[in-house]
């Protein structure tokens, strides 16, 4: 989704591959995959970002980036 990242491409690609592999291993249909990934994102924000305002800004930024990445395809 991101056009620029502070993370190395290899690190990002490996993490993405691992997440996809887990979903495939469980034969998760699209709706279940999206639910699980959404829950993961929610938990990451709730556990790591202290204020609700900051969480909402990050959630909005993430949502916009996701929508933009779908337009590009």
UniProtKB/Swiss-Prot annotation:
Pfam families: DUF1414 (PF07208). InterPro entries: UPF0352, YejL_sf. Belongs to the UPF0352 family. HAMAP family: UPF0352. This is UPF0352 protein HD_1515. It comes from Haemophilus ducreyi (strain 35000HP / ATCC 700724).
């Amino acid at each position: 989704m991101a056009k620029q990242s502070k993370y190395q491409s290899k690190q990002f690609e490996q993490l993405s591959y691992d997440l996809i592999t887990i979903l495939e291993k469980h034969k998760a249909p699209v709706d279940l995959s999206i639910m699980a990934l959404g829950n993961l994102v929610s938990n990451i924000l709730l556990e790591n970002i202290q204020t609700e305002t900051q969480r909402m800004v990050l959630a909005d930024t993430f949502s916009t980036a996701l929508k933009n990445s779908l337009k590009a395809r």
